[in-house]
């Protein structure tokens, strides 16, 4: 158990660090190839926060653990809304008053509904995985389109372009790219192995380990980014990161896992967890908009989200 716990902790730390290095290298190489900083920011950098979830999902699916991959995607989305947004709003109310939110919220609802419908029959096929990934590509194209037609001070642009790395020699960027990718692969295997060992020790299902340890662990970068963003007064960053990450989780994380290992999924994922994900997403929408008027997600609502997260964790472990 001690070794498995160390594997999980070391795997999480390496996973988060290697994802950052991979994005750094890829972004630097793209910049050296004279690709527009806007396109780099809206594609490579935007995908960076979901890289750990994507790699863990791929690793779990490759090992034949589709339920872990599904649990990772659903659990990350639930954690992002209930825990991350809840904790952020409790720290400081989140202002919801930008074009970014009005653009991305309808997509989040649509993509969440798509995920719910595909999971409803308790199975995922490669055709559905291909549709997820096709939707992911379309989402990236749409983000670039928005960026090209947005004013210079649009949060969508400033948020991601601010995260671009400084000019870096191509050889150094290549080293970071290769090292980041290698460590992403190794750390995801370490994390999944440790998590599965812990799950076996406590009699936990593959789905449960994905919904809890893995999902919460891979959501830590979003939690840190949102807390830092709200303290800096960058409310769009705090909320926009979560909306974008949740869209990526359904389209890319579920898509990759389904392409690698299609099959039957745990009935709880198709029922209980899909319902909670839908309910959390709709709750976030209702808290963000009241009768069409933009408003804030206040501390009381943040507390409600956190209590819902605690209640959901209790439900998982008591079932």
Curated annotation (Swiss-Prot):
GO terms for molecular function: calcium channel activity; calcium, potassium:sodium antiporter activity. One of its GO terms (biological process) is intracellular calcium ion homeostasis. It is a multi-pass membrane protein. Keywords: Antiport, Cell membrane, Membrane, Transmembrane, Transmembrane helix, Transport. The chain crosses the membrane at residues 3-23, 38-58, 81-101, 105-125, 127-147, 175-195, 208-228, 250-270, 275-292, 297-317. It is found in: Cell membrane. The keyword Transmembrane helix applies. One of its GO terms (cellular component) is plasma membrane. Confers modest Ca(2+) and Na(+) resistance. Belongs to the Ca(2+):cation antiporter (CaCA) (TC 2.A.19) family. This is Putative antiporter CaxA. The gene is caxA.
């Amino acid at each position: 158990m001690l070794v498995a716990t160390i594997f999980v902790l070391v795997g999480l730390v390496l996973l988060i660090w290697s994802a950052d290095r991979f994005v750094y290298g890829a972004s630097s190489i793209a910049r050296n190839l004279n690709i527009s900083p806007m396109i780099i920011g809206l594609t490579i950098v935007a995908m960076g926060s979901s890289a750990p979830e994507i790699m863990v999902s791929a690793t779990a699916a490759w090992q034949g653990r589709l339920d872990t991959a599904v649990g990772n995607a659903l659990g990350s989305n639930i954690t992002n809304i209930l825990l991350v947004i809840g904790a952020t709003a409790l720290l400081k109310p989140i202002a919801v008053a930008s074009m970014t939110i009005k653009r991305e919220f309808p997509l989040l609802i649509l993509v969440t509904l798509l995920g719910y419908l595909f999971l409803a029959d308790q199975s995922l096929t490669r055709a559905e995985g291909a549709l997820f990934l096709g939707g992911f590509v379309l989402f990236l194209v749409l983000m670039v389109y928005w960026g090209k037609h947005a004013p210079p001070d649009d949060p969508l642009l400033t948020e991601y372009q601010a995260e671009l790395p400084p000019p870096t020699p191509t050889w150094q960027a290549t080293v970071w790219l290769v090292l980041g990718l290698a460590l992403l692969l190794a750390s995801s295997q370490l994390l999944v192995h440790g998590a599965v060992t812990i799950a076996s020790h406590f009699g936990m299902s593959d789905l449960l380990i994905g919904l809890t340890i893995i999902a919460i662990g891979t959501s830590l970068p979003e939690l840190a980014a949102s807390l830092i963003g709200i303290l800096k007064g960058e409310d769009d960053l705090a909320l926009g990161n979560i909306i974008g990450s949740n869209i990526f989780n359904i389209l890319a994380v579920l898509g990759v896992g389904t392409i690698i290992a299609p099959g039957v999924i745990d009935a709880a994922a198709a029922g209980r967890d899909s319902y909670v994900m839908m309910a959390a997403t709709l709750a976030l929408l209702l808290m963000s908009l009241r009768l069409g008027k933009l408003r804030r997600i206040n501390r009381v609502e943040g507390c409600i989200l956190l209590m819902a997260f605690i209640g959901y964790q209790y439900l998982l472990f008591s079932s």
